[in-house]
Amino acid sequence: MNGTLDHPDQPDLDAIKMFVGQVPRSWCEKDLRELFEQYGAVYEINVLRDRSQNPPQSKGCCFVTFYTRKAALEAQNALHNMKILPGMHHPIQMKPADSEKNNAVEDRKLFIGMISKKCNENDIRVMFSPFGQIEECRILRGPDGLSRGCAFVTFTTRAMAQTAIKAMHQAQTMEGCSSPIVVKFADTQKDKEQKRIAQQLQQQMQQISAASVWGNLAGLNTLGPQYLALYLQLLQQTAAASSGNLNTLSSLHPMGGLNAMQLQNLAALAAAASAAQNTPSGTAALTSSSSPLSVLTSSAGSSPSSSGSSSVNPMASLGALQTLAGATAGLNVSSLAGMAALNGGLGSGGLSNGTGSTMEALTQAYSGIQQYAAAALPTLYNQSLLTQQSIGAAGSQKEGPEGANLFIYHLPQEFGDQDLLQMFMPFGNVVSAKVFIDKQTNLSKCFGFVSYDNPVSAQAAIQSMNGFQIGMKRLKVQLKRSKNDSKPY
């Protein structure tokens, strides 16, 4: 179906094939042509039909190709989310077809730097036109209208843009420039977001480094909750932008000793610290004195709780930190409280006598310190604790007591048993961690189980890890249902 006689047989090279939804099923190509030709000559219309019906019925959507790109964009501006067709409840949806995404503007747009400020748009067009048809050329100018010495050039195809890069990048030094011309693909919105987050994180790192708190674990009592909360926020933002940025975080001073998984543990620690700081105080006060860590352990063990012994057992895991506390002069309860950003809340707070939520938050915070201490002071930390737990728990399917078994959805495809174990170890003693594998494909099914030796650790893990973002996925962490339930999970 060709357009009017004043058009060639084929549409322009930069024409866009558009997908159109929310079209009445009773409309045919003729009806649609009358609608679209208001904005320009139409080359082709293809109504999508259900071939399983006889005769085939419209699916309420179509593809339309105008002769010119301009006509397609004008139609989109006038119709998309603007016009409701007869008999429909929602406005027309009009956007470039999926096949057009392969030729998106951001894939064809070049940034040209180090150009002479005497050049205008026409000069740039002449310079780059040998490499293909130029769709747009724009020189960046300041408020005074003067050139900033850089420009954007958009070709009609990516291949043309790549040819221009190979031929022109650093090929000459223009008048008034100190270095050769720069020709590269322009930053996409995703690139800009990643750079912004990395820059923001770098600034905060420098502030923390200036405070000299990371070089000495005993000095971490100066690390306030605002810093831990900031790390949690930045880690989540970065994961949303690009999972690869976690590697960038781990390479930045002064966090160079932490890998991506340990950074995630630190983020979980921040959430735990924040939860503990906001918890109402109970009846058993916990003071930030200079007593050794063992005092905290014994105090927790004797604190009253309405939920029985199960709510205080997790505090026994703090004994693993006594070696670290003893080996580090000056590292006492006050220092550890500062590290966990609890120094404000613990001074007047205490272990809850009702819900045990403060106890849970403390369990999260101090077990999280084990992960940080292992990364920051490996020579002082007893690595055998983690090694023994890893060997015994990863890949096994042992179950803990009632209420201590978790079901984890939306795991990244590449996660294995060991990754799952490391992610949930900060919240207590893991007796098993298992990622389920499809036996036919040998690939992860993206869900798994984690079992603790007590319910409080499981609740702590749910509180911090449910909704935690890894890459483009958010974990769903919930208790595994009782065997007595009709549905196992």
From Swiss-Prot:
Domain named RRM: residues: 16-99, 108-188, 404-482
GO biological process, one term: mRNA splice site recognition
Record key words, sorted: Activator, Cytoplasm, mRNA processing, mRNA splicing, Nucleus, Repeat, RNA-binding
A Pfam match: RRM_1
Localization per Swiss-Prot or TrEMBL: Nucleus; Cytoplasm
InterPro entries registered for this protein in UniProt: CELF1/2_RRM1 (IPR034196), CELF1/2_RRM2 (IPR034198), CELF1/2_RRM3 (IPR034199), Nucleotide-bd_a/b_plait_sf (IPR012677), RBD_domain_sf (IPR035979), RRM_dom (IPR000504)
Signal sequence extent: none
Entries under PROSITE patterns matching the protein: RRM
SUPFAM superfamilies, per database record: RNA-binding domain, RBD
Its biological purpose: RNA-binding protein that may be involved in pre-mRNA alternative splicing, mRNA translation activation and stability.
Family listed: Belongs to the CELF/BRUNOL family.
Protein name: CUGBP Elav-like family member 1
Protein's organism: Gallus gallus
Gene: CELF1
